Amino acid sequence: KDTVVIISSVTGNTKEVVEAIKKIKEEVGATVISFVDAKEAILLDLGDYKISYPVNEQLKFFMVADRFMFNNGEFEDYEDMYAEFDKYLAQDLVEVEKQAEPFAIEFAKKHWNDEMHYFVGAGNQWGATYSYAMCYWEEQLWLKTKSITSNEFFHGMFEIVTKETPVTIYIGEDAQRPLSERVANFIPR
């Protein structure tokens, strides 16, 4: 009963997720926060708190996590940071999208028909690496991918990478950065 579960879904009707949330509510009594892209969905009905907004998934998660940390006395700069967000974040996100568009178009032209695309990451970038490959490329674009951690790269994958192999490497700014940099330095150019 002292548990909060945050669930994110595009449709809000995935059978296994719906069953899991029902079980969590019935057996644990957890409070459920539902982020669902669709405006009508079973997961919205099951959520104690509901947000139906189909963009910026990571931003929603971070905002909720930030608030939990603030409420727990672990984020003393919270109010100042969110005052800055209120002033600048919306416009800055639009500007970043505009600036990224030419790169995104060229990347899409180059990789839209990859037979297989590899995504490599570690540390604080592993979640983004994994979900980008699976959710965006496989589920949404129907393109074959493989996500692999940077530390696993040298245990097999490096044997099959050539100059023509499409590889995207996520390099974070945490203690595992050297692992991803090692992969980046190894990849043939």
What is the predicted role of each segment?
Residues 20, 40-41, 107-109, 157-158:
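A generic local secondary-structure boundary/capping motif
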Residues 2-3, 46-47, 114-115, 163-165:
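Short, well-ordered alpha-helix to beta-strand connector turns
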Residues 50-51, 57, 69-148:
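Active-site phosphate/pyrophosphate-binding segments
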Residues 127-189:
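Internal helical hairpin/lid segments
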Residues 31-35, 99-101, 149-151:
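Short amphipathic alpha-helical surface micro-motifs
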Residues 1-80, 86, 122, 170-188:
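Glycine-rich phosphate-binding loops that contact phosphosugars or nucleotide phosphates
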